[in-house]
Each structure stands twice: as structure tokens, then as C-alpha cells.
């Protein structure tokens, strides 16, 4: 049927054009027509404008969203109706402009529940929980969405006390809950690692009949795993009738993080379908366990099966290469990334720098750092400074820190740790003390136990025990294992028996099963010729069933890394003769180098 009114023809054409482009997300072209349509006196339908605003928000197209807002003002809608105002609020919040959203909200003639929830949700997603709370408290009425938003907002922010308070108040309000009501509670369980809280949440989900919800069940399993309760996690897993890939991966990750790689790999093999995340969970577990070779074997198998690695897969495998100082494996991973056009993120680039450094190729580390497109991430600088520290280049590390500050990159707590280590390994006591003061005064970094441990190591290695004791007395907290370890380490270097004995006693109290304090104290006694105390200490270790951890060494033979321990000499190591031959040659090189110095 032909359009009789000629004024309606451009409206229909415009509507058709904009609708078409909105569905294709070609917002720039669609919105660019608004000005010409306005000049023709065409007022667009509300539902079309609402649809465009929603797409602007979803694609974070702020410029186009503002054009639509301007179109509304020009065409006489300085105060749009409730529908359009709600969409404007949503668009501004999604585009990270909560102040603009607040202006729209304040100018509304009539607000509905969706308007209030939109503001609360927007503030929560922007991390502005104080403002979200103010709006929530001002609401004339609330529904399940209002309460769910506040619970999950506080839980994700790590404010577990407030999250639980809101959850309890919500349940007391009498408003009917839904499956999403447990999402915030379970997020709090995962973050708090409180077993009793998780059991209560598990019980409530079970009673409510929502255990079939895969997301909730996955959170319950994750919470049990983080509490170290793998039996409960596995029981929950076994009771599930529907298991998706995320459930399997969560349980595998739980076993891997607790070091039970046998259970993790068994479950991995039983998986009906595997994805890059499940492969990465297993690889990362072996890296944490110190089994770099096994992690790299899995990576090669993953590639052979055509599974595409993700960013965390690369960072884990590069850490595996670094842990066994295998430059060849690290280069292979780097080469694969280049061949497959992988654009590495900050963590992967830092892992590359670290891998090359620990594999003895500092030049390659510096080359990777130089070609970084964006050096505004503090992680790059920290890793490079740490690499220079590992190679004993303290002065160069200090120059790198100066460059970092000139580049207007704000140092963080890790920066202070790595620069103190750099100064410690190069004997730069004055420079280390200067940066310790500078970081706290100029950059607002509050020193923690790890920073003081580094400072003690710096002073102790240089033999400045008076200054060391003064710093210990000035600490605003009681020493923890980091600090006592640092004290014992420097006492071992300088043979300070009295302070070393005190540090060892404190470490044994903190971690009775660790053999490290016994061994270091035993070395101090041995250096002083006090063999009766050495024997006595060994007797104490035997009585308390403290076993010395075996030190593992790696050596590359025919492009394969072989691991061996001291005790392997008396056993049938598969490649014992080849290892002996290489070690004999290395010893000869070391003796020759030593004779030259």
C-alpha cells in the first residue's frame, strides 16, 4: 500500500536505514544521519532511539551515544521520557561516564524501579560502591535485582563483611530470591576461603533446588578447592548430573593448585572434551610443582593436537622454561608465538624477559624490552630491573629505574622489592637506603614484611649489622618468616652465630616441617668448627622427622633436559655416564676460569 502522506516517506526511509545499520552495529554511519534528519524536521520513533542507545552502550560507542542525546535535545526532548532516560543512563554507565548518567537520572520527571536499579548497577560496575549504597538507601522500593546487585558488588570488591550483611538483610526482607541471589554469596565464599561459610551456602543452594545450575555448582566446587577440601569438591562434582567443561576445569585446577598432580592428570584424561583452559590448568600445576619438563611435554602435545594456546598458557610455559634454564625451549615457544601471529599481553612479554634472563641471555631480554610497543605498564620495567639484578648489574638497574620514572611510570611495591635486590646483589648499600626512603616518601609505598626482608638482606650482606638491628627495631610490625629467613641468610654469610640461632628458632616455630633453618644453622656451626652442635641438630631433625629436601639439577643432553640429584650417582640413572662426562668437562672449565682470576 503506497504511503499517502509525503512527510511520512522520509521518516520511513530513515527508520529503515537506521534499523538496518543498528542491527549490523554500523553505528557511526547510522548516527551520522541524525543531524540531516533533524534539519528535515524528522523526529525518530522512541523505540528506534532506544535500540540505538542500547547498541551504543553495548559497543561502548560514547561519541555516537552523545549524538543521539543531542538529537533528543534539539528535537524538543531536553527531558526525555522514562524509557529513553533509562537507556541514556545505561549507555553512559556502560561507556564509563557515571557523572553524565547521574545528570540524566536527576533530571527525570518520572523514575521507575528500572531507573533506580540502572543507577545502582552502573555504580557497582564502575567500582563506586559508596555511591551505589547512597542510591540503594534512597530507593522508594527494591526488588530482587536491587539486592543481588549490592551483594555481588561488595563480594567482587572483596568487602566480604558488607556482602554477607546485605545477603542476610535481603533474606530477611521477604523478597523472593532467584538463582542469581546466590552468585554474590558464593563469590564471597570463594574469596574468603571460609569452609563453614561455604558449607552453609552449599546447603542453602541445595535446599533452594538450584544445585543443577552449572555456574552455582562450579562456584561451590571452586570454594571447596580453595579451602583445601578436595574430598568435598569431588563429592559435589560426582553428584552432578550435568557437567560442562568449566566444572571439569575447576576441579582439575583445584587439584593442581594443591599439588596433587596425579589426581589432576587422572581427571584431565577422563574429560570428554578439553579446551585451552583445561590444558593450561594442568600445565600451570606442573610449573608450580617445579616439574618444568612435564609442563613443556604437555605444551608440545597440546600443539600437536591442534589446541590453540591462550595467553596464560604461554606465560606458564615460559616460566617452565625459565625454571629449568632451557633457552632452547624458551626460544621454541617464542618462535611459535611469532609464527602464529600471537600478540602477547603484558604478562607474556614479562615472562619472555624473565625466561631469557634466567636462561643466561640478558641481551635477548633487553631486546624484548626495547621492542615493547607500550612501556607504560609497570610490569615490564619491574621484570627488566629484576633481570639486571639477577646478573649483578646493580648500577644498570638503577639507571633503568631512573628511566622508568622519567617515562612517568609510577613505581609500585614490586618495584621497591626488585631495586632493593639489585642493590643487595651489587653491594650498593647507600643507593638502596636512598631508594627505600624515596619510595615511601615520594611515591607513597608503605613498606611491608617483604620490603624489610630485602632491606635486611642488603645491610646484612654488606656486614652493616648495627644498622640492620636498628631497622628491625624500627619496623612497625613483628618479623615474619620473610624477615627471619633474610636474617638467617646473612648470618650464614658472616658467621653470626648468636643472631643466627635466634632467627633459626623463630623460623622453626613458624614452620616446624621446613628443613631450611636447620641446614643453615648447621652450616654456621660447621664454619665455627662446632661439630658436636651439628650432630645435635641432626639428631633433633631426625627426632622431629624433618627431612632435607633433595636439590635437583638439570642438564641438557642431545636437546633433552635431564634432571638428577646427588643420590642418583649410586643408582642406575638412565644417562649417568653422559651426565658424568658433561659435569667433568664443566668442572675443568670452572677450574680454568678460577685460575685466571
From Swiss-Prot:
GO terms for biological process: RNA modification. GO terms for molecular function: RNA binding. Pfam families: E_motif (PF20431), PPR (PF01535), PPR_1 (PF12854), PPR_2 (PF13041). Gene3D superfamilies: Tetratricopeptide repeat domain (1.25.40.10). It comes from the Eukaryota. Keywords: Repeat. The keyword Repeat applies. PPR repeats lie at residues 45-79, 81-111, 112-142, 143-177, 178-212, 213-243, 244-274, 275-309, 310-344, 345-375, 377-411, 412-447, 448-478. Residues 559-591 are annotated as: Type E(+) motif. Residues 483-558 are annotated as: Type E motif. Belongs to the PPR family. PCMP-E subfamily. This is Pentatricopeptide repeat-containing protein At2g21090. It comes from Arabidopsis thaliana. The gene is PCMP-E48.
Amino acid at each position: 500500500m503506497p504511503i499517502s502522506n509525503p512527510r511520512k516517506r522520509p521518516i520511513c526511509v530513515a527508520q529503515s536505514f537506521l534499523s538496518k545499520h543498528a542491527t549490523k552495529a554500523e553505528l557511526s554511519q547510522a548516527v551520522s544521519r541524525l543531524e540531516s534528519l533533524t534539519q528535515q524536521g524528522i523526529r525518530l520513533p522512541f523505540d528506534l532511539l532506544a535500540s540505538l542507545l542500547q547498541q551504543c552502550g553495548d559497543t561502548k560507542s560514547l561519541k555516537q551515544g552523545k549524538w543521539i542525546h543531542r538529537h533528543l535535545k534539539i528535537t524538543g526532548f531536553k527531558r526525555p521520557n522514562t524509557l529513553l532516560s533509562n537507556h541514556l543512563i545505561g549507555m553512559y554507565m556502560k561507556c564509563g561516564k557515571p557523572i553524565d548518567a547521574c545528570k540524566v537520572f536527576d533530571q527525570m520527571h518520572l523514575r521507575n524501579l528500572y531507573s533506580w536499579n540502572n543507577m545502582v548497577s552502573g555504580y557497582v560496575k564502575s567500582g563506586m560502591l559508596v555511591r551505589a549504597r547512597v542510591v540503594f538507601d534512597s530507593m522508594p522500593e527494591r526488588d530482587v535485582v536491587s539486592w543481588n546487585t549490592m551483594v555481588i558488588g561488595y563480594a567482587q570488591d572483596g568487602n566480604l563483611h558488607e556482602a554477607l550483611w546485605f545477603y542476610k538483610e535481603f533474606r530477611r526482607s521477604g523478597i523472593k530470591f532467584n538463582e542469581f541471589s546466590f552468585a554474590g554469596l558464593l563469590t564471597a565464599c570463594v574469596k574468603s576461603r571460609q569452609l563453614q561459610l561455604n558449607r552453609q551456602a552449599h546447603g542453602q543452594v541445595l535446599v533452594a533446588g538450584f544445585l543443577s545450575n552449572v555456574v552455582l555448582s562450579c562456584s561451590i566446587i571452586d570454594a571447596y578447592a580453595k579451602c583445601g577440601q578436595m574430598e568435598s569438591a569431588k563429592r559435589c562434582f560426582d553428584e552432578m548430573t550435568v557437567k560442562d567443561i568449566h566444572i571439569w576445569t575447576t576441579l582439575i585446577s583445584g587439584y593442581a593448585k594443591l599439588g596433587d598432580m596425579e589426581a589432576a592428570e587422572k581427571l584431565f584424561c577422563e574429560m570428554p572434551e578439553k579446551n585451552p583452559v583445561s590444558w593450561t590448568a594442568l600445565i600451570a600445576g606442573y610449573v608450580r610443582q617445579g616439574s618444568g619438563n612435564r609442563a613443556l611435554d604437555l605444551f608440545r602435545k597440546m600443539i600437536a593436537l591442534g589446541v590453540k594456546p591462550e595467553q596464560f598458557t604461554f606465560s606458564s610455559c615460559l616460566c617452565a622454561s625459565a625454571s629449568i634454564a632451557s633457552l632452547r625451549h624458551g626460544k621454541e615457544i617464542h618462535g611459535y608465538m611469532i609464527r602464529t601471529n600471537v600478540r602477547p599481553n603484558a604478562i607474556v612479554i614479562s615472562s619472555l624477559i624473565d625466561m631469557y634472563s634466567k636462561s643466561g641471555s640478558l641481551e635477548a631480554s633487553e631486546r624484548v624490552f626495547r621492542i615493547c610497543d607500550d612501556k607504560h605498564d609497570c610490569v615490564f620495567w619491574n621484570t627488566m630491573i629484576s633481570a639486571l639484578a639477577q646478573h649483578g648489574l646493580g648500577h644498570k638497574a638503577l639507571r633503568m629505574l631512573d628511566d622508568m620514572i622519567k617515562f612517568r611510570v609510577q613505581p609500585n611495591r614490586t618495584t621497591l622489592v626488585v631495586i632493593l635486590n639489585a642493590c643487595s646483589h651489587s653491594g650498593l648499600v647507600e643507593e638502596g637506603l636512598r631508594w627505600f626512603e624515596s619510595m615511601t616518601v615520594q611515591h607513597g609505598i608503605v613498606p611491608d614484611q617483604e620490603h624489610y626482608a630485602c632491606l635486611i638482606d642488603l645491610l646484612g650482606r654488606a656486614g652493616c649489622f648495627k644498622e640492620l638491628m636498628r631497622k628491625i627495631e624500627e619496623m612497625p610490625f613483628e618479623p615474619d618468616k620473610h624477615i627471619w629467613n633474610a636474617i638467617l641468610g646473612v648470618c650464614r654469610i658472616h658467621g653470626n652465630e648468636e643472631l643466627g640461632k635466634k632467627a633459626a628458632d623463630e623460623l622453626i616455630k613458624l614452620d616446624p616441617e621446613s628443613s631450611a633453618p636447620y641446614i643453615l644453622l648447621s652450616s654456621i656451626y660447621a664454619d665455627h668448627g662446632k661439630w658436636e652442635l651439628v650432630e645435635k641438630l641432626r639428631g633433633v631433625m631426625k627426632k622431629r622427622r624433618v627431612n632435607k629436601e633433595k636439590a635437583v639439577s638439570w642438564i641438557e643432553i642431545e636437546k633433552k633436559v635431564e634432571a638428577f640429584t646427588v643420590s642418583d650417582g649410586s643408582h642406575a640413572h638412565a644417562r649417568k655416564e653422559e651426565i658424568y662426562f658433561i659435569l667433568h668437562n664443566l668442572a675443568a672449565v670452572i677450574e680454568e676460569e678460577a685460575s685466571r682470576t
